[in-house]
Amino acid sequence: MIIMGRGKIEVKRIENKTSRQVTFSKRRAGLLKKTHELSVLCDAQIGLIIFSSKGKLFEYCSQPHSMSQIISRYLQTTGASLPVEDNRVQLYDEVAKMRRDTLNLQLSLQRYKGDDLSLAQYEELNELEKQLEHALNKIRARKLELMQQQMENLKKTEKMLEKENHDMYQWLMNNQMYKQESAAMDHEDHHHHHEHQQAITELNLLGEQPLLSHFTFFGDQEQPSTSTVNHFASISLTSPPANSISPYRLQPSHPNLQDSHVHGPSYD
């Protein structure tokens, strides 16, 4: 029961967990503050230890002392002593347990290796067989997993190499086609150039021959040759338009034939 100015307040455990935690935090801070003020103002050595409901430790110790010094001084002053716990029995038990575990591990290792099975009972051998089969299944599963991973890596590598091979093949084919097209174009240009040069040569040779040698005059019974006709055709095809040639009448070279009134011989 706490008596305050406005009335009496009953002190009891706060049932609400949240309210209890908030109250604990506020009261703890106030208690630590008052303890510090008392230590400073009155030069008192104070050691305050607080454990929360969850087991969390809060403490305060007057400077420059430590909590262990204050507790030792308390024990000396009161004549009390801390109980010394004999841990030898507990240590013996732990050592014995470790020895048993080590022996069991050694026996299990020997049985797994098949070194000493003379003292093993049927149940122990059956259990050992199950354990070995289980371990063997795990080993096989892991081995299969590694093999599958290697196969996947090999497939990826194969696909990558196939793609590189396909790209290289396409590049070679395109390069070969380009070379063939370039060679064909060069050959065609050379052929056209050769034909052009041959035509020019023929025209030059034709220009050097007399023009009248390609015609047959009156009274000549010899028919023109095929080469003459071809030359004449080429001259006709390559000659300039008629309107660009000035009219010119061919005249025989004999003086008697140059008369405009030429008559044949008369026979009376």
UniProtKB/Swiss-Prot annotation:
SUPFAM superfamilies: SRF-like
Molecular-function annotations in GO: DNA-binding transcription factor activity; protein dimerization activity; RNA polymerase II transcription regulatory region sequence-specific DNA binding
Signal sequence coordinates: none
Chief place of localization: nucleus
Domain K-box: 88-178
Record's GO cellular component terms: nucleus
Keyword terms, alphabetized: DNA-binding, Nucleus, Transcription, Transcription regulation
Domain of life: Eukaryota
Pfam family, one: SRF-TF
Function: Probable transcription factor.
Domain MADS-box, chain residue ranges per copy: 4-64
InterPro entries on file: MADS-box/MEF2_TF (IPR050142), MEF2-like_N (IPR033896), TF_Kbox (IPR002487), TF_MADSbox (IPR002100), TF_MADSbox_sf (IPR036879)
Localization per record: Nucleus
Record's protein name: MADS-box protein FBP24
Annotated segments matching region Disordered: 243-268
GO biological process: one example: positive regulation of transcription by RNA polymerase II
